[in-house]
Curated annotation (Swiss-Prot):
Belongs to the CFAP36 family. The gene is CFAP36. InterPro entries: BART_dom (IPR023379), BART_sf (IPR042541), CFAP36 (IPR038888). It comes from the Eukaryota. Keywords: Cell projection, Cilium, Coiled coil, Cytoplasm, Flagellum, Nucleus, Phosphoprotein. Interacts with ARL3. Residues 192-203 have a biased composition (Polar residues). The modification Phosphoserine is found at residues 85, 147, 201. This is Cilia- and flagella-associated protein 36. May act as an effector for ARL3. One of its GO terms (cellular component) is nucleus. It is found in: Nucleus; Cytoplasm; Cell projection, Cilium, Flagellum. Residues 165-204, 262-292 are annotated as: Disordered. Residues 147-187 form a coiled coil.
Length: 313
């Protein structure tokens, strides 16, 4: 009797595993995860949006499982027993059941969404590198990149300040000459009408003219310096927006390509008459190496720095 129960549990586990590897499950689940994972990050704070998306995911999982279990005649008790059996505790089975467990456990769900978001970003970056040969500066990792960005920004700032100083000096010289010319023009009527007061008039004219050479218009110098800096901030903000838009386009295109590939693979599988469970072999996801984790951390630090620059500006 015990052997029969074990055989029944084993059959239920294998049936569920076959369904979870098949297109009826994997296509809608993968589409949902890829479309919704963009807003997930590894911050400790759980946003309200996360909860709403998790509820949508839970409803999708329940609908798919309920339909399948009715088709093959497995009741809820059998399903629960199969999920808690030793056969479902292996690493292979846990990897297969992760999307199901994520519907009940928000922590598992969030980790799954963060992992998929990271995977999508890395795939988009690889596509950019393959097509362009090199990565944009904002997508290369490491502290050296941040340093390069800062150095480039300093070069731009110095150049802007240099040009600003030249323009300021030219403007000051032009105003000085204009004021000298106006001062001389005012002296002529005074010389014609009062010859006796010529020396005094000239003294007044010189007194008026000389300070003009060092005339400082309040706020002008400050405004001249702030203008280029403001332009620089606008330039950097616009550049960041363009980069973000560029990466989003690549991401959307990648999702479209992946969806088309899945549809074609599904059609090919149906034409050959093979069950999806036989076509797809379950593979365990390799854990990230320390180097990959370090690379990911550096990329996230850079992304946060760029995000702060955009928000602050």
């Amino acid at each position: 009797m015990a052997a029969e129960e074990e055989d029944e549990v084993e059959w239920v586990v294998e049936s569920i595993a076959g369904f979870l590897r098949g297109p009826d499950w994997s296509i809608p689940i993968l589409d949902f995860v890829e479309q919704k994972c963009e807003v997930f990050d590894d911050e400790e704070e759980s946003k309200l949006t996360y909860t709403e998306i998790h509820q949508e995911y839970k409803e999708l999982v329940e609908k798919l499982l309920e339909t399948y279990l009715k088709e093959i005649g497995i009741n809820e008790d059998q399903f629960q027993e199969a999920c808690t059996s030793p056969l479902a505790k292996t690493r292979t089975s846990q990897a297969i059941l992760q999307p199901v467990l994520a519907a009940e456990d928000f922590t598992i769900f969030k980790a799954m969404m963060v992992e998929k978001n990271t995977e999508m970003q890395l795939q988009a970056i690889r596509i950019i590198q393959e097509r362009n040969g090199v990565l944009p500066d904002c997508l290369t990792d490491g502290s050296d990149v941040v340093s390069d960005l800062e150095q480039e920004e300093m070069k731009i700032l110095k150049e802007v300040l240099r040009k600003s100083k030249e323009e300021y000096d030219q403007e000051e010289e032009r105003k000085r000459k204009k004021q000298l010319s106006e001062a001389k023009t005012e002296e002529h009527p005074m010389q014609a009408n009062e010859t006796a007061k010529m020396s005094n008039s000239q003294g007044d004219g010189e007194h008026f003219a000389h300070p003009a050479s060092g005339l400082k218009i309040p706020g002008f110098e400050h405004a001249s310096m702030e203008g280029p800096i403001a332009n620089l901030s606008t330039l950097r903000t616009e550049e960041l927006r363009q980069r973000e838009h560029y990466l989003k386009q690549k991401r959307d295109k990648l999702m479209s390509m992946r969806k088309d590939m899945k549809i074609k693979q599904n059609q090919t599988s149906e034409q050959k008459g093979k069950p999806a469970g036989e076509v797809e072999e379950m593979t365990e996801k390799p854990e990230m190496t320390a180097e990959e984790k370090q690379t990911l951390l550096k990329r996230r630090l850079l992304a946060e720095k760029l995000k702060e620059e955009v928000i602050n500006k």
